Swiss-Prot record:
SUPFAM superfamilies attached to this UniProt entry: Ribosomal protein L30p/L7e
Protein name: Large ribosomal subunit protein uL30
Natural source organism: Pseudomonas entomophila (strain L48)
Lineage of the species this protein comes from: Bacteria, Pseudomonadati, Pseudomonadota, Gammaproteobacteria, Pseudomonadales
Source domain of life: Bacteria
Subunit structure: Part of the 50S ribosomal subunit.
Segments passing through the bilayer: none
Cited Pfam families: Ribosomal_L30
GO BP term, example: translation
């Protein structure tokens, strides 16, 4: 299955609680942290919800 690189580029401090949980669910911990996640509908949904804090490649 294809993977997607996701990087946290903005802080989760002061954000909507559900968006914070999406970032946590993707495995991101701090600004500049990059993870590779599988390109599934569940992960795409989390990325789309918190898109303004993330950089997505692939």
């Amino acid at each position: 299955m294809a993977t997607v690189k996701v990087t946290l580029i903005k802080s989760v401090s002061g954000r909507i609680p559900n968006h914070k949980l999406c970032v946590k669910g993707l495995g991101l911990r701090r600004i500049g942290h990059t993870v590779e996640v599988q390109d599934t509908p569940e992960n795409r949904g989390m990325i789309n919800k918190a898109y303004y804090m993330l950089k997505v490649e692939g």
